[in-house]
């Protein structure tokens, strides 16, 4: 619920392009679309893991089946200097039916990235510096500051993210860490009942890298406490 507006219980990043006559969240999305996206050339939507999530720093490089735009967006993503780049093509192509802030930018022909740095509501020096570094690189790429961007020398590209889903209610405990490389079938966590008894073990549905872990123990059946990234085949 950390991402929901208290007035209408909606997530801003799921209400684009918005509605000026809608709920408070829908009105805010419409304002961003009208006043920012219509006037910008590039967008970076900066996220973190908030208070409940641990994550491997990464950047989403969306694509909308427009060769020129998709290529420019990917070049922008690499220029940030972030090592882990997730290719993301599961958002709408129609600007009238977009979903998120970056998706709305993309449907208007403008590169829109999402970065994920930091976790558990912390603002320690390493996370702050990483965010400043990607910001400087982006400004170099856009010729808004003198200098050249420094792409990561060994970028890791992911084709898809896959959720690990709990079949039961309970308390989740991970058995792997962020950045762990796992094989399909590896036990990545367990769900216990309120008396501490193991109800089920959760396994990875794929070979991949652990990208996100929810650190708050309660989990409901059908929810995902962990996300695995599938690396692009070279």
Model feature map: region roles:
Residues 1-234:
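Structured catalytic-domain cores with a bias toward divalent-metal coordination
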């Amino acid at each position: 619920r950390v991402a929901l507006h208290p007035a209408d219980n909606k997530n801003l990043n799921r209400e684009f392009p918005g509605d000026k006559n809608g709920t408070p969240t829908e009105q805010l999305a419409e304002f961003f679309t009208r006043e920012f996206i219509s006037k910008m050339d590039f967008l970076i939507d900066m996220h973190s893991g908030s208070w409940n999530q641990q994550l491997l720093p990464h950047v989403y490089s969306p694509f909308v089946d427009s060769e020129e735009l998709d290529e420019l967006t990917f070049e922008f993503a690499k220029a940030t200097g972030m090592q882990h780049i997730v290719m993301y093509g599961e958002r709408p192509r129609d600007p009238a039916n977009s979903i998120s802030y970056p998706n709305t930018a993309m449907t208007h022909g403008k590169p829109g990235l999402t970065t994920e740095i930091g976790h558990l509501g912390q603002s320690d020096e390493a996370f702050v510096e990483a965010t400043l570094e990607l910001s400087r690189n982006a400004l170099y790429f856009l010729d808004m500051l003198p200098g050249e961007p420094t792409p990561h020398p060994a970028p890791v590209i992911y084709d898809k993210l896959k959720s690990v889903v709990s079949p039961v209610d309970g308390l989740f405990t991970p058995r792997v860490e962020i950045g762990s490389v796992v094989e399909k079938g590896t036990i990545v966590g367990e769900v216990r009942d309120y008396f501490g008894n193991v109800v089920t073990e959760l396994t990875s549905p794929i070979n991949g890298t652990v990208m996100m872990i929810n650190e708050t123990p309660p989990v409901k059946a059908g929810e995902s406490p962990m996300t695995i990234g599938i690396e692009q085949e070279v």
